[in-house]
Amino acid sequence: MVIGSMLTATPLSAFMARQGRRAGFIIGTMGGAIGAAIGAYGLYTSSFLLFLIGALFSGIYMSAQGFYRFAAADTASDAFRPKAISWVMAGGLLSAVVGPQLVKLTAQSMVVPFLGTYLTVVALNFLGVFLFAGLKIPKPKPPAPGAAMGRSRMELIRTPRIAVSVIVATVSYALMNLVMTSSPLAVVGCWFETKDAANVV
C-alpha cells in the first residue's frame, strides 16, 4: 500500500493540477474500491499475490486522501482556511476511531475472515465516488504565458528547512507504519481476539 502511494502521489498531483481536485479524488476512491475488491478476492481464493496487488491499488486512495487538506486550503476563504484544514484533520482522527470499529463488526461476518471487512471498504469507496461527484471545486487556472515557474525539486531539497522536514516526515511515518502494522499482529499472536487488536493502536 505504501509503495502504491509512493508511485502514484506525483502523477496524481500532476493530474489534479490539470483536471482539478474532484477528478483526482474520484480516481483515488475508485483505486480504493478496486484495491479492496482485489484484496477480497485474494482472501477468498487464498492468493497472497492478489492480496498484495490489491494493497498496491489501495495505495492510490492512500495517496489521494493526502490532498484533502490542500483542497480545503484552495477553496476556503482566507478567514475560514485554518478552520477548513482543521476540519479535514479532525475527520482523519475520527476515521482512526471509526475504522477499527468497522473491523470489529465485519471481520468475522463471513466464512473467510476479513472478507466482510474488505467488501465494506469497497462499498465505502463507491459511496465516496458519489460524494466527490457532487463536490464543487473549481479547476485550477492554467499558468499565464511566460509566468515564473517554481523551484525545481533539487533546489527545494537543497533548502535546509525542507530537507529536515522531509527527513523528519519520512522517519516518523515509517515508525507509525511499523507500530500500526506490527502491534495488532502481536496482539493476535498473544491469543487475543481481533476485536481486542482493533483497539490497541
Region spans (language model):
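C-terminal membrane-cytosol helix-exit motif in multi-pass small-molecule transporters
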Residues: 103-104, 122-143
